[in-house]
């Protein structure tokens, strides 16, 4: 089992978005998705890295046609158990790096709200974005989430007192950028890195 499968097999992804701070994330994200949907009904939506289906299921219940792609079998199992009786959602096992099962410009909206957390080099990050762009209609919307370095530094290292642990494990650069590998699970980025990937 790889690091990601092992992590999510033992992590309560359902509980994360149900927590107080998780609700802020969920409601804020849904507000922007609804802004993109506008007055029109029945959008075709792809969620890449759908987790246990919190966004995908809610959007399907609102009448949209949803394809939900999830990498980890544990989360996919949970999502599949929750969609019984919902006919306008289709789940898939797969990776954000390969969306070849989907045609070009197939979706009005593509959500990439988790995969970038687990991409550890620029080549993979660019590939995820290229695939999302390819499957999204020219006038469509793509939503992408990242783990931001500075927020993590403030919350995890300073507030939680973990800075010396990171220093001792050589997980910080001289300018306090978190160094991540696959075993660390999450890749922290700065705005300038996102800008460089998007260039």
Would you name each region that the model predicts?
Residues 1-40, 42-49, 54, 58, 141-170:
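Conserved class I S-adenosyl-L-methionine
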Residues 109-123:
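A short SAM/SAH-binding and catalytic strip from SAM-dependent methyltransferases
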């Amino acid at each position: 089992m790889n690091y990601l499968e092992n992590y999510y097999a033992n992590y309560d992804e359902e509980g994360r978005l149900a927590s107080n701070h998780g609700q802020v994330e969920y409601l804020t994200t849904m507000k922007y998705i609804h802004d993109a949907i506008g007055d029109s009904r029945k959008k075709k939506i792809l969620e890449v890295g759908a987790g246990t289906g919190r966004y995908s299921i809610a959007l399907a219940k609102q009448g949209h046609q949803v394809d939900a792609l999830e990498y980890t079998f544990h989360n996919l199992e949970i999502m599949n158990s929750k969609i019984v009786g919902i006919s306008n959602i289709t789940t898939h096992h797969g990776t954000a790096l390969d969306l070849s099962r989907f045609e070009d410009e197939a979706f009005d909206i593509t959500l990439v709200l988790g995969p970038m957390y687990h991409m550890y080099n620029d080549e993979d990050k660019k590939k995820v974005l290229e695939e999302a762009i390819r499957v999204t209609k020219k006038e469509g919307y793509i939503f992408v989430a990242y783990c931001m370095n500075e927020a993590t530094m403030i919350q995890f290292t300073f507030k939680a007192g973990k800075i010396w642990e990171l220093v001792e494990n050589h997980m910080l650069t001289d300018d306090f950028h978190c160094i991540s590998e696959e075993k660390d699970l999450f890749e922290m980025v700065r705005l300038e890195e996102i800008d460089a990937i998007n260039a």
